[in-house]
Amino acid sequence: MSKNFEWVTPDSDLLERESTKVQPPKLYNVVLNNDDYTPMDFVIEVLERFFSHDIDKATQIMLKIHYEGKAICGTYSAEIAETKVAQVTMYSRENEHPLLCTMEQA
């Protein structure tokens, strides 16, 4: 009892299915940059609080920031990366630290 239906519109005889490929979202790295004023303990706190790193991983990233000038804290979709940058920047300013948090395409 299977019935096949054809959808007809006034302008065309038959609607056709159009195959579309969904692209995965572009990913962005959230980066913390070194400065001479933000304490190392504060950077570790930020990494634990906003990026869910454990103390060991947060310490490794903090040392990379200190010695190499910057380090990737996490990779996210654009909206999440923007939110992380805004949260870290706001938290840093509230605590009177000039910590620079940016995002760049992965």
UniProtKB/Swiss-Prot annotation:
Pfam families: ClpS
Ranges in a coiled coil: none
Gene3D superfamilies tied to this protein: 3.30.1390.10
Biological process, per Gene Ontology: protein catabolic process; proteolysis
Domain of life: Bacteria
PANTHER family: ATP-DEPENDENT CLP PROTEASE ADAPTER PROTEIN CLPS (PTHR33473:SF19), ATP-DEPENDENT CLP PROTEASE ADAPTER PROTEIN CLPS1, CHLOROPLASTIC (PTHR33473)
Subunit structure: Binds to the N-terminal domain of the chaperone ClpA.
Family that this chain belongs to: Belongs to the ClpS family.
Function (record text): Involved in the modulation of the specificity of the ClpAP-mediated ATP-dependent protein degradation.
NCBIfam families found in the cross-reference section: PRK00033.1-3, PRK00033.1-5
Annotated protein name in UniProt: ATP-dependent Clp protease adapter protein ClpS
Species name: Vibrio campbellii (strain ATCC BAA-1116)
High-level lineage: Bacteria, Pseudomonadati, Pseudomonadota, Gammaproteobacteria, Vibrionales
Gene designation: clpS
